[in-house]
């Protein structure tokens, strides 16, 4: 909390666009979610999301992301905007469980839904590999032609 509060305050003061809380283990992710919850209970207006690895959040036996192999990929882009809008209207805290429910309700890929939702979040809780591993990084935030003033908690 001693590190999170000043980072959230900096975002509120316009000193950054988005906060990335980087974790290595599930317990650290849980602690980050709890810290955001405590601040939200005290009145913080801040949308946070927890990103879960594709292999862990995928509904299919095999993680094969193409419309021929995955029923959630087929027509995904026809439905995902409604799923994103609906979820953003209803929730501030976007967790694995809530993303899975929304993905099931709208029959969309839960991993891709979480990535789309992350663009609307003030804070992103994720594995540090999404930032530091070039094969896993979040291209929508860290590609060469993308810019943003991001704060990182490691």
Spans of model-derived segments:
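Short, conserved "post-DEAD/DEAH" coupling segment immediately C-terminal to helicase motif II
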Residues: 137-147
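Walker A/P-loop
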Residues: 1-6
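SF2 helicase catalytic motif II
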Residues: 130, 146-154
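A substrate-engagement module of RecA-like helicase motors
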Residues: 15-124, 128-132
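Short glycine/serine- and small hydrophobic-enriched flexible loop segments
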Residues: 8-12
């Amino acid at each position: 909390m001693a590190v999170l509060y000043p980072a959230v305050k900096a975002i509120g003061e316009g000193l950054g666009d988005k906060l990335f809380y980087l974790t290595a283990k599930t317990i650290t992710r849980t602690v980050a979610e709890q810290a955001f919850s405590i601040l939200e209970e005290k009145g913080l207006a801040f949308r946070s999301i927890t990103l879960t690895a594709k292999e862990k959040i995928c509904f299919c036996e095999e993680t094969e992301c193409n419309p021929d192999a995955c029923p959630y990929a087929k027509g995904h882009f026809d439905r995902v905007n409604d799923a994103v809008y609906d979820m953003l209207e209803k929730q501030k805290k976007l967790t694995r469980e809530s993303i899975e429910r929304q993905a099931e309700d709208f029959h969309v890929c839960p991993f891709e839904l979480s990535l789309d939702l992350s663009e609307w979040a003030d804070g992103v809780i994720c594995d540090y590999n999404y930032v530091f591993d070039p094969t896993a990084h979040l291209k929508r935030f860290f590609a060469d032609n993308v810019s943003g003033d991001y704060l990182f908690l490691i």
